[in-house]
Swiss-Prot record:
Gene that this sequence comes from: ZNF80
Subcellular location, record wording: Nucleus
Protein name in UniProt: Zinc finger protein 80
Disulfide bonds: none
Zinc fingers (C2H2-type) by residue: 69-91, 97-119, 125-147, 153-175, 181-203, 209-231, 237-259
Family: Belongs to the krueppel C2H2-type zinc-finger protein family.
Keyword line: DNA-binding, Metal-binding, Nucleus, Repeat, Transcription, Transcription regulation, Zinc, Zinc-finger
Keyword check for Transmembrane: no
InterPro entries assigned to the protein according to its UniProt record, in alphabetical order: Znf_C2H2-type (IPR050758), Znf_C2H2_sf (IPR036236), Znf_C2H2_type (IPR013087)
Function: May be involved in transcriptional regulation.
GO cellular component: nucleus
Organism: Macaca mulatta (Rhesus macaque)
Amino acid sequence: MQKGPLSLATVSHTETFWRKVGPKRDGLGTGDGLHSWVLQEPVSTGDNPRECDSQGTSKDTLVREGKTYKCKECGKVFNKNSLLVRHHQIHAGVKTYECQECGKAFHEKVDFVRHMRIHSGEKPCKCVECGKVFNRRSHLLCYHQIHTGEKPYECSECGKTFSYHSVFIQHRMTHTGEKLFGCKECGKTFYYNSSLTRHMKIHTGEKPYKCGECGKTFTYHSVFFRHSMTHTAGKPYECKECGKGFYYSYSLTRHTRSHTGEKPYECLEHRKAFGYHSAFAQQSKIHSGGKNL
């Protein structure tokens, strides 16, 4: 399709730009490659006027010549003015998309759409191995490694391997003891800012995840996800010794100790060992004079 000239310079840094649009895509597939171009409304990007030497230059030429737009706040660069305008909204605190269910707001439409799946229960991403469905493609990709057994990340300190890079990085910090993020409410420290953000929900009481089956709400998505499994038929984790089923893998691990006799928790005061951490913690509390460890 023939595209006309593209004007990028107006007074007071107000710029007109073209936006590329294409066919709607699903969560996992790709488009058919057919796109069109539409003219956006002029958008002001700040109070600093500047001259642009690209009047009459097509968008394709701008990309080929390496024309970039730089954010004066953080230095991030973009090859499209439209992306810079959208990026500026982050610094300005503008959140265009607001959820009518819970009031949470988002900068980007794609984040808003993902969030709405929490309320609607929509799960468009399906595992081809077992049929399990997810509301995000990233969750599906992580889950799929259960079937492949792939653990490409190995700790050089202890040799332990991990399926996910984020878990591997967090494990590495357990060797260094480094915790960078502290809670201002209670002083608890964390390896990651994301962990601190999750922790803060305890203080705020926020429970954004609601079960569509029973209405129960949860602070964390992981707990909500495990709870949702209780409504599905069957218990995926089964004991090979007695056939008892469990919803969670850690429950099966605890149960297996009743068959193996394993007692991994040892009290250093009188060398007594325990099969479960809860029993060990109770014993340790006695030695510490009733103080929580």
